Structure formats: structure tokens, C-alpha cells
Amino acid sequence: TSLRHAIGQRKEAVPAIKRARSPHANFSAFNFAIARATFLQHSFDERLKQYGHEDTLFGQDLRYACKTVVHIDNPAYHLDGDSDAEFVEKTEVAIDNLADLIRSGKIDEEVRLFAVYRKLQRTGVLYLIQLLRILFASSIRALLIGGVRSVLLFDFYKLLRLSGHTIKIGRRNF
């Protein structure tokens, strides 16, 4: 199995009842239902040109507009056949896009990766993560591309990638 499949099974194959506990935070474009009028009023932001987090932004927009999201059990099948290298590259673009969305104020801490980033930032541990990125990110990337199917390692790699971005919150740069 591919890295994409392993991640999909672990992160996307979550029952609707569990995702419904925090409906906007767990938003994904393949398993929700909203009123047609709501969708037309709050459609996906066409200005996003980079891969990744279009659905995250859409979910946040719905939350800010106090719109109800109903999660449904709708299995996702990834038929694109991305190699592990292609999947990691897409993930990197998605994290870079997420950083841009955070900087522009469109994404808040309801997004789990950003919430972890902010917690590390507040506690002063982000500097350690940034050092770990310098020391280990390329090795971890090689492991992921080379066949390691660890969701934990993949999530850590995403955090390392995000820590490479300067994200200004308030008057300070991080």
C-alpha cells in the first residue's frame, strides 16, 4: 500500500458520528451535506491556486457564517495513484498553502496542525521544533518516500514543514 492509502485509512476513514463532534474542524469536502443555497452562497474560494486546504477554508467559512454542516459516511477512494514522493510533494504544497492562509487570517486554531503549532509557540518549544526541522526534516522525508508508513511520522513531518514558515500573529513574528 502507498503512503497516501495509509494516511487516508487512518485520517479520512473516520465515522461521521465522530467527525460530527466538531463538525467544522473535521471538515472534508468528500463527506458532508449542506443545503444547496448555502453551498451556492459559500462556495469554495476560487482564488486559491495552490493545492491543499480548500476544504479547510470552506469549513471555516461555514463556521464563521454559523452554517450547519452534517457529516455523512461516504468512503473516499484515492484512485489517482500518486507515488509516495508525489504525495509528500503535494503535502508540502498543502502545508505551504496552509501557512499562507494562516498569515492572511483566514484559518484559525480550530485546524489541528495550527493549534499544535500555536501551543508550541506559546510554550517556547517551537524553537526546538525549528531546530529539529533543520536537523531531521530531509531524513524524515526520505523515510516517508522510502516506504515508511507511519502516520505519526507523517504528522510530525507536517509540523516540521509548518515550523519553517514565519507566521505573524498580532504584532510578533513567529
PLM feature segments, named:
Residues 37-40:
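Short, well-ordered alpha-helical scaffold segment located
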Residues 50-58:
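Acidic donor-binding loop at a coil-to-helix junction in glycosyltransferase catalytic cores
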Residues 14-34, 49-51:
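A recurrent flexible, glycine/aromatic-enriched loop bordering the glycosyltransferase active site
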Residues 1-5, 68:
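Conserved donor NDP-sugar-binding/catalytic core segment of glycosyltransferases
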Residues 59-63, 160:
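Short, hydrophobic alpha-helix immediately C-terminal to the catalytic nucleophile
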Residues 93, 110-174:
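Non-catalytic, C-terminal membrane-associated alpha-helical segments of glycosyltransferases
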Residues 65-89, 94-105:
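Active-site donor/metal-binding and catalytic loop motifs
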